[in-house]
Amino acid sequence: MSNYAPFIKPYVEYNEHGWGPCEVPELDVPYQPFCKGDRLGKICDWTVSLPEKKFPSKYASTFGNSSQYAYFYEDDDSTFHLVDTTGSKAFKPYQRGRYRPNVRNNVRARGRTGRGNATLGGLGGPVAGGSTANSTKYGKGRNTRNAQNMGRRFGRNAPTRLRESSVMVQSDWVSIEEIDFPRLLKLALPNIKEGKDIATCGSLEYYDKLYDRVNLRNEKPLLKMDRVVHTVTTTDDPVIRRLSKTMGNVFATDEILATIMCCTRSNYSWDVVIEKLGTKVFLDKRDNDQFDLLTVNETSLEPPMDEEGSINSAHSLAMEATLINHNFSQQVLRIGDQEPRFKFEEPNPFEEQGVDLASMGYRYRQWDLGNEVVLIARCKHNGVVQGPNGDMQFLSIKALNEWDSKVTNSVEWRQKLDTQRGAVLASELRNNACKLARWTVEAVLAGSDQLKLGYVSRVNPRDHLRHVILGTQQFKPQEFATQINLNMDNAWGVLRCLIDIVMKQPDGKYLIMKDPNKSMIRLYDIPENAFDSDGDDESESSEPFGNSIDN
């Protein structure tokens, strides 16, 4: 028994009146309130450089912070210094995509492989191993808009392109009215009847139907036609001067009217000069102006840049498109001394002796716009063709041009024109909506029976001097206006609105200008001698395009 330790019974207090010990010694121990829901954290964390900004009180007690357990070092030893030999790492803010892998050349991350070994980009664009044509073919152009904004977060970082104004606004010009496009789109002037011919001048050559058979397998080169085209403004037209003495109170040309009536589709800046003399209003264009140049890809997502010296700059493409349109409209006609011509009642008012004039027929037409507003405008035809019933059908001949489908991210004509002509036309409607609308309005105003469109492309994308005709297509102007969603009632309403504003002004000179960077038009009161210095050489308006354009 001596080998075992003795068992000592512990002292157990017995509480007859409740639970727990009977007596507790007072030790002056303070009580810290706590909550069982508090998170348990570290007492001190020397590895965190900065506290959390989003949840600064993540480990704070529900009952508040108490300083009774805080440690205070009372002895101040100023002679002791702690030297930290490790380099401190500067705090860097969080960067989005910092640890994202490089997917520039990762085909699996960019897209998948389609038929014909064409790689389709997951972000809407072609990658290594695939071509633009195949991507458009199998992707059906679904992500072409997103492909324009690759590398930008929803286009927020897209650079803002500031366009130049067509005319410099002077300090002595007085702003009269500013009308934004949403207001213009609400206007309507219905029930405008067909224009009535009051004078017809010039002569027309017959259309060569062989060009209707032109296709991708039977393309024809575009020839240079050295024939004079007159671009005379309203006040310089001798026929309008004669008619203004006896009839009408608003006078213009079809180009000026089409520009105003289709202003809601324009992006580039343009201007029209207005002269008010009593109850008569003349809509003019400035001398030596680029008003007659055709725009290229004006309404596309990526319009041409203004690069000086480049063949693909906005100005160079406009000159090229104007030259193509002139040459095409004359080449598709049956030209020759032995060929018949359709002659109007009066000769060409701009005829000059010894000058080969282009085939052009002028029709001076009259419209009643209501409220004693009578419009007289000079309209034109480019050719004539004999219909199936033997009747004469007047033509408005225009040309669309392709310069580089890869740059414009559009449909390639040499692959789609014969099989999917609708896709080609839809692409042109998206990129040149304003130009096509103007051509349609001009054809409707002139009363043309057909609007003939030609498809002209460069022989080589890097050569802007040689072109080929790939095909032609014809429409009825009224039906084509419906297809492109052109509301003629709204177009007449826009014109009538501006005429009413000018009619309320005193006699003088005014200017309508499309704002270069905003969707609005502005009306200014300008001095009488505002553009007198621009009209020194009036002969430039009647030069042939072959001499005025460097080709």
Swiss-Prot record:
GO BP term (any one): regulation of translational initiation
Protein family according to the UniProt entry: Belongs to the eIF-3 subunit D family.
Record comment regarding domains: The RNA gate region regulates mRNA cap recognition to prevent promiscuous mRNA-binding before assembly of eif3d into the full eukaryotic translation initiation factor 3 (eIF-3) complex.
Regions of compositional bias (Gly residues) in chain numbering: 119-128
Keywords: Cytoplasm, Initiation factor, Protein biosynthesis, RNA-binding
Region named Disordered: 108-152, 530-551
Quaternary state and interactors: Component of the eukaryotic translation initiation factor 3 (eIF-3) complex. The eIF-3 complex interacts with pix.
Role description: mRNA cap-binding component of the eukaryotic translation initiation factor 3 (eIF-3) complex, which is involved in protein synthesis of a specialized repertoire of mRNAs and, together with other initiation factors, stimulates binding of mRNA and methionyl-tRNAi to the 40S ribosome. The eIF-3 complex specifically targets and initiates translation of a subset of mRNAs involved in cell proliferation. In the eIF-3 complex, eif3d specifically recognizes and binds the 7-methylguanosine cap of a subset of mRNAs.
Sequence segments annotated as region (RNA gate): 290-304
Superkingdom: Eukaryota
Main location: cytoplasm
Comp. bias intervals (Acidic residues): 531-541
Pfam families in the record: eIF-3_zeta (PF05091)
Gene name for this UniProt entry: eIF3d2
GO cellular component: eukaryotic 43S preinitiation complex; eukaryotic 48S preinitiation complex; eukaryotic translation initiation factor 3 complex
InterPro entries in UniProt: eIF3d
Record-given protein name: Eukaryotic translation initiation factor 3 subunit D-2
Keyword Cytoplasm: yes
Compartment(s): Cytoplasm
UniProt keyword Protein biosynthesis present: yes
HAMAP family from the UniProt entry: eIF3d
Record-level Gene Ontology MF annotations: mRNA cap binding; translation initiation factor activity
